[in-house]
């Protein structure tokens, strides 16, 4: 399968994985391995600096995975920028998944504060991957600001509803000059396959892997879904049409056409 390129860096996997909600760090590590992912997101607020032996980061091989700190929990641009700076000061690479979600109930991203934070972080040398509503206009503004990707949601975080914003994501993909990563709401392998068939460059999944009784098994299923969707997109899906069209000719065998 062709490689994903973000900010000049190449990845063989197009599946990004989040680290929240897993019942244990060992289950998370097994899921990461089964997913084949090379980009792993982690909330800085979940890192236990005082107990490194029990810390989440102790279970993530930094030589194998790109650790992508996220600004989960930030309610405005100032908080998001502060979290990104803390991650870099803690030794993380200057890559950040930008999340600004002032509403704790639906966790929908704030477009104004996200753009404001992105502009600041790009100027400070961060590789910014912003989580956004499926808003084509905002996506263009973020690309113009210098973000490395745009990450439109398929559905609200953790809902497992799939690609409910399909029409808007299709516009974003059509207009994008950076990779498009569909993030949030993807609850089944068929959902990620759908996103990849549309032409998305990658997907990010967390809840669907973390809450299943078999995280590693589900991670493998998502890996296969991403690969199938990407291969179908590259091969070229047939156009949909209203009328039926037989795959074999119906004439000249049972009867002669006049």
Curated annotation (Swiss-Prot):
<dbReference type="GO" id="GO:1990107">
    <property type="term" value="F:thiazole synthase activity"/>
</dbReference>
<protein>
    <recommendedName>
        <fullName>Thiazole synthase 1</fullName>
        <ecNumber>2.8.1.10</ecNumber>
    </recommendedName>
</protein>
<keyword id="KW-0808">Transferase</keyword>
<comment type="pathway">
    <text>Cofactor biosynthesis; thiamine diphosphate biosynthesis.</text>
</comment>
<dbReference type="Pfam" id="PF05690">
    <property type="entry name" value="ThiG"/>
</dbReference>
<comment type="similarity">
    <text>Belongs to the ThiG family.</text>
</comment>
<comment type="function">
    <text>Catalyzes the rearrangement of 1-deoxy-D-xylulose 5-phosphate (DXP) to produce the thiazole phosphate moiety of thiamine. Sulfur is provided by the thiocarboxylate moiety of the carrier protein ThiS. In vitro, sulfur can be provided by H(2)S.</text>
</comment>
<keyword id="KW-0704">Schiff base</keyword>
<feature type="binding site">
    <location>
        <begin position="206"/>
        <end position="207"/>
    </location>
    <ligand>
        <name>1-deoxy-D-xylulose 5-phosphate</name>
    </ligand>
</feature>
<comment type="subunit">
    <text>Homotetramer. Forms heterodimers with either ThiH or ThiS.</text>
</comment>
<feature type="binding site">
    <location>
        <begin position="184"/>
        <end position="185"/>
    </location>
    <ligand>
        <name>1-deoxy-D-xylulose 5-phosphate</name>
    </ligand>
</feature>
<dbReference type="GO" id="GO:0009229">
    <property type="term" value="P:thiamine diphosphate biosynthetic process"/>
</dbReference>
<keyword id="KW-0784">Thiamine biosynthesis</keyword>
<dbReference type="GO" id="GO:0005737">
    <property type="term" value="C:cytoplasm"/>
</dbReference>
<feature type="active site" description="Schiff-base intermediate with DXP">
    <location>
        <position position="97"/>
    </location>
</feature>
<dbReference type="InterPro" id="IPR013785">
    <property type="entry name" value="Aldolase_TIM"/>
</dbReference>
<feature type="binding site">
    <location>
        <position position="158"/>
    </location>
    <ligand>
        <name>1-deoxy-D-xylulose 5-phosphate</name>
    </ligand>
</feature>
<dbReference type="InterPro" id="IPR033983">
    <property type="entry name" value="Thiazole_synthase_ThiG"/>
</dbReference>
<keyword id="KW-0963">Cytoplasm</keyword>
<dbReference type="InterPro" id="IPR008867">
    <property type="entry name" value="ThiG"/>
</dbReference>
